[in-house]
Each structure stands twice: as C-alpha cells, then as structure tokens.
C-alpha cells in the first residue's frame, strides 16, 4: 500500500524545524512509522490472543507475529477502527482533523487553520514517491486509527512543533539580549525566519 503518492508538501520553515530536531527528516518519520506499526501489531495480538484461545475452531496459532496478525485480520469477526466507529450508537464520524489543520481547511463549520501556516507556501516535498507500507502493517494500524494519512500527518506535525519549540527555546533569549534587534516578528513563523537568518544559528539535528 502506498500513501501520499504525490508526497507531503511542507514549507521551508517547517523543513528547518524538522532538521533542527533530526538530521534526516524522512528517515526519522519512516522510523517513527515503523515503531508505531510494531506497537499496533503487538497491541492487536495482545487484544485478540484470549479470543483465539477461547475459539474452539482455532486448533493452532502461528509462532510468527506477522502471520498471527494476518490470521486475526482475516477473521470474520474482526473490524477495523473505522468499521467499529461506524457501527457505534451513535456512529463516530471520520476524523481527519490533522489533515484539515495541515491543509488549512475547515471541519464542521469550524476554522482549524493554524495561524502561521499557509499551505500554498509549501515548496518542499517529503516522500516524493509516497510512503510504502505492507498491507499487513497498514491494517494493523487501521485496527486502531480511522485514517492512515491523518495519522501520519499528526505525527509529522508533532515533529515539526517539537523542532520549532526547541529552536525557539534556544534562540529567543539570544535574540532578546541582542542589542542589534530593534523589532520582533508578530508570528512564530516570522520568528523562525529571523532565527534561521542569524549568523549564529546552528542546526540542532
């Protein structure tokens, strides 16, 4: 399965925030996805093992975790998180809040655009060929989240924000003590631009 087949577009400042946190943004995000996939697979197996043991039609279980996960995913009584939410009373709607924030769109009539983010300013592409997951890995995650792309965008935004906070925490006091600075930007994005333009800026990642 390939998600984000056209890549993920971010701004140069968002890229800088990522690179202030890690040396390779794509590798870090991919590593995070891999770790999350394993944790979701482990959770799925832990949740379902008692049910499998109680099912008289199950005479043996695979010793391999991936094969065991595939057995669970193939069962008639297995439901994805989206299917469970749709069957709830009342049904739980599809949540793509992270995507909405990232794209600067609205959800249910509420503006969710982040003040500093203008999607049209995005000029950097991450994962230009998309992110590839095996069907089993994707389905293990979908046991617990409604939408894969919304989940990945949430993780990406989290890393960007951590890098931004780390950068600001280090350089804001330096700027405030700099007599040559006569005015401060009114937005975080403007502050990031100011920090990146400084001759004493050193990338943290």
Sequence positions of predicted segments:
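Compositionally biased, non-globular sequence tracts
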Residues: 2-4, 13-127, 136-205
């Amino acid at each position: 399965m390939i998600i984000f087949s056209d890549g993920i577009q971010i701004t140069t400042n968002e890229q800088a925030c990522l690179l202030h946190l890690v040396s390779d943004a794509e590798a870090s995000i991919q590593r995070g996805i891999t770790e999350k996939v394993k944790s979701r697979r482990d959770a799925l197996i832990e949740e379902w093992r008692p049910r499998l043991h109680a099912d008289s039609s199950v005479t043996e279980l695979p010793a391999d975790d991936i094969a065991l996960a595939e057995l669970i995913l193939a069962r008639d009584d297995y439901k994805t998180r989206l299917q469970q939410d749709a069957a709830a009373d009342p049904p739980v709607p599809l949540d793509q809040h992270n995507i909405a924030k990232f794209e600067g769109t609205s959800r249910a009539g509420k503006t969710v655009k982040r003040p500093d983010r203008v999607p049209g300013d995005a000029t950097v592409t991450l994962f230009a060929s998309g992110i590839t997951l095996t069907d089993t890995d994707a389905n293990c995650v979908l046991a617990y989240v409604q939408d894969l792309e919304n989940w990945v965008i949430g993780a990406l935004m989290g890393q960007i924000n951590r890098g931004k906070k780390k950068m600001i925490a280090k350089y804001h006091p330096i700027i405030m003590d700099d007599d040559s600075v006569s005015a401060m930007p009114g937005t975080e994005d403007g502050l990031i631009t100011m920090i990146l333009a400084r001759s004493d800026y050193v990338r943290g990642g």
